[in-house]
Structure formats: structure tokens, C-alpha cells
Amino acid sequence: MFHFSIGTVLISICWLAQWMEAKSQRIDPDAENELWDSIKHTKVQNIVEKNAIGEINSPPTDGTPYLKVVCISDTHEQLHNVTVPDGDVLIHAGDFTNNGKREELIKFNEEMTRFPHKYKLVVAGNHELGFDHDENQGERQDADKGLGTEDGYNILTNVTYLQDKGVTIDGVTFFGSSYHPLRGFPFYRNRAEQLAECWKAVPNDTNVLITHTPPLGYLDQFGDERWGCRDLLKTVERIQPAYHIFGHVHEQHGVLSNGNTTFINAAQCNKGNQIQTRPIVFYIPKKTLS
């Protein structure tokens, strides 16, 4: 009969985790499926259920002041077909247009005025052509070449546009960034080197992180492929924001939790860019200075 001490077991677990991490570092960073398979055994993914009106939690009942946050993404020129509940903060995680045309941006900006939310936070998606100064437009798909609006975010006067920027609302820190690993679109950056550097901009005190792309393995599956970013997942696990809001993968609308962070894919459209889901709502306590 073999006898193992608790210390021996803990050492074995730590060794296994280190071995899995070392193994993942040797995998081609573009081999997303293989990469996820090498680390998924160490990840926690609990499904968070929504109620009939899209809420994933309840407001505090002890008198604690709170923000009601409403999350949408990937509306693709169909925002007028979305029933958006009232709240304090409205988040749009990108792809509000189909290709960033000026008329699409004007329409979106005007549509956002009809919502009563005091704060409207927006990040760009890969379909907001012209928003990324550093885009290699020669890599665009043929159908997208010549389209978009350079510096089109300047048209968005009715929202707070976040690109590597943050805002603090009643003590709650929000930070937004649009980078993703899908080649041929604005805000594309290659996996590992460039994206790892991009995510260093996320402050350690971020409470609500808003990106367009999902992190690897969390509501990121498109067909047989994983579209998420490993380095983004590392960043989320390091800073542990209370919420991570994103979209990009239409088929994966939903909510997961790893125990520290709630991951929300707020995509509204299906593959045919028709609205098929409702916004997701959460409540977060305000923070007061002591």
C-alpha cells in the first residue's frame, strides 16, 4: 500500500501545472485548438445563468449603492432591432457597423442618443474599418479594401470611445481595448509577441474589462476553431477584473465564471447578422473613497 502526504500531493500538482504551462509555451501560438487543449484542464468554467430579462445577478438589498450595467456587442447595423433595458452604464463591445462607413457611424451615433443610460462606453470591433491608425490595409479582404472612415471614432460624439483607455464611474474602473488575432482587419495583432505587449496597457486595478475579442477558451469557439487570445486570458487571470465583456464570436453569446472573473460574450447577432439575443445585465457595487 502506498501512502502519500498532503505535501507530496501539493508538490505533484504544482509540478503538473508547471509542466502543462511549459508545454503550452512550445506550441505554435496560432494553433489555438492545440494550445487550449494543453491548458484547459487547469481552467475553471462555470456556466452563469441569465434570467428572462438577461440579468445574471441581483442588485444589493442592503442599501449598498450600485451601478446597473447593460452589455451589448456585434449589432452590425441592427441596433434599432435591439430592446435595450434601462441602466446606468451601457457597454457596446464592438462591431456596431458592417464596414465603418460614415453613414453607418452617423446612424449608430444617433441611435445611441435614444438610450437613457448616463454612461455609454464603446470599443471598436474588427468591422470598424478606418479606426486603427496602424492597420496594414494591404492585408484586408478584397471586399473591404477602400472602405471605412479614417478616424471615424471622432463621429461618435454621443458615447465614450475607449481604445487603450479607461474611465472611472462612481469608483468602478472600466477599461477598453480593441485588439484581436484575426488577420485582415483593423486592430489585428499577431499572437504572442504583439498581443502580449498590447495587453500590458490594461491597468491592474481594472474592475470591468471591455475588449472585442474573447480570451482563449472562454466563449470563443467558431465552428471547429478557437478565436480567443491566450495572452488576453493570461492578463485577465493576472489582474482578475470582476467582469470581462466582449463579443466577436456571434455563436457563443453567454456567460461563464472562473470564480474570480465573470466572462460575458454579449454578441447580439447570429452568423447572418440578424439580432437573435437580448442584452446581458449585471449589477456592481459602487466604490467610495475611504
Curated annotation (Swiss-Prot):
The keyword Signal applies. InterPro entries: Calcineurin-like_Pesterase (IPR024201), Calcineurin-like_PHP_ApaH (IPR004843), Metallo-depent_PP-like (IPR029052), UPF0046_metallophosphoest (IPR051693). Keywords: Glycoprotein, Signal. The keyword Transport does not apply. Residues 1-22 form the signal peptide. Glycans are attached at residue 204. GO terms for molecular function: hydrolase activity. Belongs to the UPF0046 family. This is UPF0046 protein K07C11.7. It comes from Caenorhabditis elegans.
